[in-house]
């Protein structure tokens, strides 16, 4: 892998590498003023690495695995498991992240509606789908080495310099820099666009405290002291505090999103804009005219058609970037299931079928801590009977946890009812009152059983309170545990660190690092086993941070709220009505209403609400998901194509609407193959399915 050195050494190697010897302004001088030399943006720290891929032995989209390799249940081999190479880790990261965001089953649509072999028209014409091109990788930082936001630009060999385009692929969740490769990167590469990725300053930065081991930008590991400012993340402890913590809490891990103490979410819009600016620099480095040994600027700000695209909180970051962009970096926005925290004006209202919804516009800190508290109990409500089972635990163990959680909720006055059934029914009713759709009833159990909700609740509570790993917020920590008893503090047979870049998602439990409750009945343990009620008092404490108005959490949440003013940019939001991780009443519905209120007739936002759509397409092959729910990926791709036609040929965007899909049905675990009959197109004339706006309100037809 070729590495461009940082600014301090650039002058010494300018001739060899063809780079300007100085950084430019924050926008990389691509604004039509100042020097015409292609200078690195000032926020780039530590130099730029580049690598070219031939599209045969290795490539941008599949890391040489191709369609079949990505579909294989067997991860790609690592040549040296104790010290994987950067190339092996990149391949593993692309494999893991691609599979994490889409349904990889053939019956579920992989290879037919999406996948490396499927072209932009939805046809199986691309074979294994490998894409040749070049990658640029660098950190964005302020010089302290504590931000170290990973930025990655992929430029496919099919890029047409006379028709330039950029698609952003901001990572979803707390994933690494390849986190949105299947959600947005793939479409951009097939379109011949440069793809601008960022990990948002959260991506998979792990610190193994017992050995003081961290990850570098390419996923390889190093001692934290030796790494210094080149570490993706090093916990802010100091040697004395680190030793004391390790003595009391052995075999624990700090993670960047949870423990950076920086509330990284406040920068996600800016990080997305930085990725775009870095992409401009990379395009100029590739296609700018050479003046001696220096590249000239070919593309200035606004010269490149740029679509901000991603899903989940990557989608939220894209919206935040578009709101913050007053200089013309972003042309349009296409996002799926955006996780966003809203500053809701008093005029805004949300209705479904003409009736006011129970609650809307709550921030994640509110609804996630509530769901984490109530979901195990709500899973026993009669309305949730038959929900998909998404846990590796024996069903009897899960049933016991659920009943015990109901009992603890009742004793502590959170739910009412004299028996488990009535307590569970009340827990589900409380979720409905908090804005969760009845369409989500079958998903309350798997969202908790999969540990998605507990993981997010703990990580974000730490982030919002800007807690140190040493704080053990609400007695939670991250650590390796005994596979049978769940006891924490055990030394792992194999450290998770060498492969955390490739396998991890940045939010424990991940890659063998589990969510631990330190105040268990028999000591620290996996939160599900620490107490009979699955660490109820820890969950109760997390909830109390919000309900009691913890000042740190309140300030952090206020710092990340968005206003929905996209400055007239054409935009599309797609979300599933059944979303139970990011409830639609707290995300897309009120955001769309706020946008129409903020922009009035200047608004160019279309919102498509998909029935039978939920947050995790990767779950759709699981029994009970396959029969009930449809893939949002299909509509995300359709939305990107609609936006492209709008930008390039002036085709009008279809108006906001509900898309009524048809579940596959059949037998759980053996649903019939997905077909176009399940997936009606977004309509140019939605008629009675149109979503309407007025006076700050949105009305979504049933």
What are these regions (language model features)?
Residues 23-26:
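Bacterial signal peptide processing site
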């Amino acid at each position: 892998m070729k590495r461009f050195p940082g600014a301090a050494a650039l002058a010494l190697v300018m001739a060899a590498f063809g780079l300007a010897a100085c950084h430019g302004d924050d926008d990389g001088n691509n604004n039509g003023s100042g020097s015409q030399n292609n200078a690195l943006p000032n926020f780039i720290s530590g130099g730029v690495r580049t690598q070219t891929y031939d599209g045969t032995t290795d490539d941008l989209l599949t890391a040489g695995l191709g369609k079949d390799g990505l579909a294989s249940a067997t991860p790609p081999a690592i040549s040296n498991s104790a010290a994987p190479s950067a190339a092996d880790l990149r391949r593993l990261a692309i494999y893991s992240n691609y599979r994490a965001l889409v349904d990889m089953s053939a019956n579920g649509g992989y290879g037919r509606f999406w996948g490396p072999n499927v072209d932009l028209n939805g046809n199986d014409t691309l074979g294994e789908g490998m894409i040749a091109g070049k990658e640029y990788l660098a950190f964005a930082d302020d010089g302290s080495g504590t931000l170290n936001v990973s930025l990655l630009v992929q430029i496919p060999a099919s890029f047409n310099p006379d028709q330039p385009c950029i698609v952003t692929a901001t990572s979803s969740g707390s994933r690494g820099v390849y986190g949105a490769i299947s959600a947005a990167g793939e479409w951009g590469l097939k379109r011949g666009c440069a793809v601008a990725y960022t990990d948002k300053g959260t991506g998979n930065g792990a610190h193994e405290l017992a050995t003081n081991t961290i990850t570098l930008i390419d996923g390889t590991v190093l001692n934290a002291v030796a790494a210094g400012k080149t570490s993706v993340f090093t916990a802010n402890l100091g040697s004395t505090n680190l030793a004391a913590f390790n003595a009391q809490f052995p075999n624990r891990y700090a993670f960047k999103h949870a423990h950076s103490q920086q509330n990284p979410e406040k920068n996600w819009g800016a990080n997305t804009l930085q990725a775009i600016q870095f992409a401009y620099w990379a395009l100029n480095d590739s296609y700018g005219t050479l003046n001696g040994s220096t590249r000239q600027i070919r593309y200035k700000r606004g010269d490149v058609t740029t679509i901000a695209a991603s899903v989940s909180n990557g989608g939220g970051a894209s919206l935040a970037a578009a709101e913050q962009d007053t200089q013309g970096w972003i042309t349009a926005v296409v996002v799926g299931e955006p996780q966003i925290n809203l500053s809701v004006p008093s005029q805004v209202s949300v209705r479904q079928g003409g009736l006011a919804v129970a609650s809307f516009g709550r921030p994640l800190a509110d609804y996630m801590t509530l769901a984490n508290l109530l979901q195990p109990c709500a899973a026993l409500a009669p309305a949730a009977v038959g929900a998909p089972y998404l846990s590796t635990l024996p069903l009897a163990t899960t049933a016991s946890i659920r009943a015990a959680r109901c009992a603890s909720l009742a004793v502590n006055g959170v739910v009412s009812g004299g028996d488990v059934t009535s307590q569970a029914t009340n827990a589900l009713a409380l979720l409905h009152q908090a804005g969760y759709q009845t369409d989500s009833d079958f998903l309350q159990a798997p969202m908790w059983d999969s540990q998605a909700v507990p993981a997010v609740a703990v990580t974000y509570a730490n982030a919002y309170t800007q807690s140190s790993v040493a704080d053990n917020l609400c007695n939670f920590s991250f650590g390796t545990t005994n596979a049978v008893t769940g006891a924490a503090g055990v030394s792992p047979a194999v450290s998770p660190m060498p492969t955390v870049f490739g396998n991890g998602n940045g939010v424990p439990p991940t890659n063998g690092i589990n969510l631990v409750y330190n105040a268990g009945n028999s000591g620290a343990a996996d939160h599900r086993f620490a107490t009979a009620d699955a660490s109820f008092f820890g969950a109760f404490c997390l909830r109390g941070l919000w309900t009691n108005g913890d000042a740190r959490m309140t300030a952090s949440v206020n710092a990340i709220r968005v206003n929905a003013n996209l400055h007239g940019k054409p935009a599309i939001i797609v979300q599933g009505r059944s979303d139970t991780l990011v409830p639609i009443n707290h995300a897309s519905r009120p955001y769309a209403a706020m946008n129409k209120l903020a922009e009035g007739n200047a608004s160019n936002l279309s919102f498509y609400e998909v029935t039978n759509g939920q947050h995790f397409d990767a779950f759709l092959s699981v029994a009970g998901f396959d029969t009930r729910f449809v893939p949002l990926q299909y509509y995300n791709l359709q939305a990107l194509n609609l936006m492209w036609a709008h930008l390039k040929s002036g085709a009008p965007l279809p108006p906001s609407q509900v898309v009524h899909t048809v579940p596959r049905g059949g037998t759980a675990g053996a649903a019939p193959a997905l077909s176009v009959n399940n997936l009606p197109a977004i309509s140019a004339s939605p008629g009675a399915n149109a979503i309407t706006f007025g006076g700050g309100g949105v009305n979504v037809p049933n």
